[in-house]
A protein has these predicted regions:
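Metal-dependent nuclease catalytic regions and adjoining charged, substrate-binding loops involved
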Residues: 230-233, 238-311
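Glycine-centered, phosphate/nucleic-acid-interacting loop/turn motifs that mediate DNA/RNA or nucleotide
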Residues: 30
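Polyanion-binding surface elements
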Residues: 1-22
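Conserved catalytic cores of phosphodiester-cleaving nucleases, focusing on short active-site segments
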Residues: 197-223
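DNA major-groove recognition helix of helix-turn-helix
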Residues: 27
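Short helix/strand-bridging catalytic loops that position acidic/His residues to coordinate divalent metals
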Residues: 218-230, 272
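Metal-dependent nuclease catalytic cores that hydrolyze phosphodiester bonds in DNA/RNA
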Residues: 56-196, 303-308
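Short helix-start
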Residues: 6-10, 33-55
Length: 311
């Protein structure tokens, strides 16, 4: 059975949009690396070689989140998984959690308010019924069937309103966000690998990218713990790379952090050069792991096979 990461010359030709003879010439010229199990066996081309020979120009665009998800390429979330292990990368994607849905609502709330619109135009509070009862379930199902707006729990709805109020009171928000491009999608190549990112706010006149985060604790101590737990350093570096691919320069990267419960404090942070450099190494290692996987060179997909001493 042929390895899914290896293509025959016909498949490679189709992927590259050239003839089979052209693929053979590229192999003979050393432009494409191929694998043979023995001298007379057919050439098999690693998927990584196809990606390397189908370059894409860095570009910026606007699209829906669903359209962005359909784009081929590694994003910050996948890089974070690769940084843990190949098995984490290969695992099934996480489903959207309630906290993620709340995060989307905050973004929408900001955009609606900047446009002079009400949050209620797009979101509505779920009816206060006991869905454990037949009558309550029927009433809720009827509400869902006729409601076109996004439904939130009452506490989440109120949290989003108060979080937005807090964000709008922060001076850094008004310095950057009103003139920024919102949810800019960037596609580019990293060392021959297709890459993508979706930036919350990017303001080219002041060369700044802002990522909005909700957190339980927006204090310096609390958010530093979140950076470690959620690998936000990798995200910051990845977004800086994305921005540089289309503008030619690296931006200042800021996290706009707002607490998701009272008192809804808001704070802005940037990462030290040491943290960004550490993330650079993590990303480079993750990309090398990914390329080795595409080339069929990975035999262990976990952490390590030897005994490791911890201290």
């Amino acid at each position: 059975m042929q390895d899914a990461n290896l293509l025959n010359t016909s498949q490679a030709a189709q992927a590259l949009g050239v003839s089979v003879d052209q693929v053979r010439r590229m192999i003979n010229a050393g432009q494409i690396r191929s694998i043979q199990t023995h001298e007379r066996s057919p050439h098999l081309i690693p998927t990584a070689e196809i990606l390397r020979n189908t370059p894409i120009k860095p570009r910026s665009s606007r699209m829906s989140f669903d359209e962005y998800c359909e784009l081929d390429g590694l994003n910050a979330s996948l890089i974070k998984r690769l940084n843990k292990s190949l098995n984490h990368y290969l695992a099934a994607p996480l489903e959207q959690s309630a906290s993620m849905a709340k995060g989307v609502a905050i973004h929408d709330s900001i955009e609606l308010r900047l446009a002079g619109k009400s949050f209620a135009e797009k979101y509505v509070v779920a009816p206060n019924v006991d869905r454990r009862t037949k009558a309550g379930k029927e009433e809720y199902d009827k509400f869902v069937a006729t409601e076109t707006r996004t439904i939130l729990k009452e506490e989440d709805y109120n949290d989003v309103i108060l979080m937005t109020e807090s964000i709008f009171k922060h001076p850094e928000f008004w310095r950057i966000v009103p003139d920024a491009e919102v949810e800019q999608v960037i596609t580019w190549q990293e060392n021959g690998i297709r890459a993508k990112a979706r930036l919350d706010y990017s303001c080219e006149p002041i060369q700044t990218v802002v990522d909005l985060k909700s957190a339980q604790d927006a204090s310096p101590y609390g958010f530093k713990k979140a950076i470690t737990r959620y690998s936000y350093d990798i995200q910051a570096n990845w977004y800086r790379r994305a921005y540089q691919s289309v503008t030619g320069h690296y931006p200042e990267f800021l996290f706009l952090v707002v607490e998701n419960s009272e008192p809804y404090n808001c704070a802005v942070y940037k990462l030290s050069e040491e943290l960004l450099h550490s993330a650079e190494l993590k990303i480079n290692n993750s990309l090398e792991l990914y390329k080795a996987y595409l080339n069929g060179e990975i035999y262990s997909k976990g952490y390590h096979e030897d005994i490791m001493e911890l201290s």
